[in-house]
Amino acid sequence: LWRDPSVDGIKTGHHSGAGYCLMASAKRGDQRLVSVVMGSTSENQRAVDSQALLNWGFRFFETHRLYDANKAISKQKVWKGDADEVQLGVDAPMLVSTPRGKYAQLKPSMDIPKTLVAPIAKGQKIGSVKVTLDGKVIAERPLVALNAVGEGGFFKRLWDELMMWWDS
């Protein structure tokens, strides 16, 4: 592993019951992988197994950035607020690793409450974004408010209350 410049983190161990163990991390481009090997018969074998796992992962998987941190991915109507909408996004970059060639099959979906009522604080969790591949959730993150929406004035709140009642 010391010959692979992409390997940037290693933790080794040995226990009579668990054998030789190794956790290694490696980064190539924007993709980071972690390998965990347990129960190897020797120090050399755990390094060989770990390198094989990392090589396999980098060869057959790719990582994509789906959403950037603090960038709007949805705008939602807000009732009774000093603004009519709130921008929603993720508070950290959302990256997913998929088998090569499967990126186009990712299906993102958002779970957002039907009605949002002010006040809403910046950073407040509003809903979630899920990413599925072949019917399985492979990533999920909270959707947060990227801007605050304060409480509207008396007449705005009254009007929106009537409109919410009318819509229900």
Predicted regions and their residues:
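Domain-terminus/edge residues, biased toward the C-terminal soluble/receptor-binding domains
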Residues: 1-168
